[in-house]
């Protein structure tokens, strides 16, 4: 699937986050070097959210704000994705308070996976179709 160069870094982050989703699910296969204990998984997700997810969401919010008001279809999708960002953030924040941590991580993983796939299949395609000129002007700082 073609990705505009401005979207490639976000897609790479999505790939890393999709691995995290697979790892956090209840039915996760064993991955070499990744423990299956619930507390170890929690420590891993905390690290990944701080290092990858927070800056990733900031980049996407920049995209959302910059594209707002230019296309009704894009606006509706952005509104939906923004609500999902908020829900995923709430799910992450509530992990330590949850009585069934394994189930909470599984739900977070499944929600995040669905969200990422929506961004890749819908948002990025719409941006490439309707905002290609704007995407040409984006340069991400690492």
Predicted regions and their residues:
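Small-residue-biased structural context
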Residues: 1-142
């Amino acid at each position: 699937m073609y990705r505009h160069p401005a979207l490639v870094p976000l897609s790479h982050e999505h790939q890393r986050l999709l691995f995290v989703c697979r790892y956090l699910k209840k039915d996760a296969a064993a991955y070499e070097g990744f423990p299956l204990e619930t507390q170890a998984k929690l420590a891993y997700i905390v690290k990944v959210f701080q290092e990858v997810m927070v800056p990733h969401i900031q980049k996407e919010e920049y995209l959302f704000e910059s594209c707002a008001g230019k296309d009704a279809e894009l606006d509706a999708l952005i509104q939906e994705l923004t609500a999902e960002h908020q829900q995923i953030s709430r799910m992450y924040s509530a992990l330590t308070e949850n009585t069934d941590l394994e189930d909470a991580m599984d739900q977070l993983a499944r929600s995040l996976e669905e969200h990422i796939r929506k961004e890749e299949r819908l948002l990025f395609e719409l941006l490439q179709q309707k905002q290609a000129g704007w995407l040409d002007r984006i340069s991400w700082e690492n």
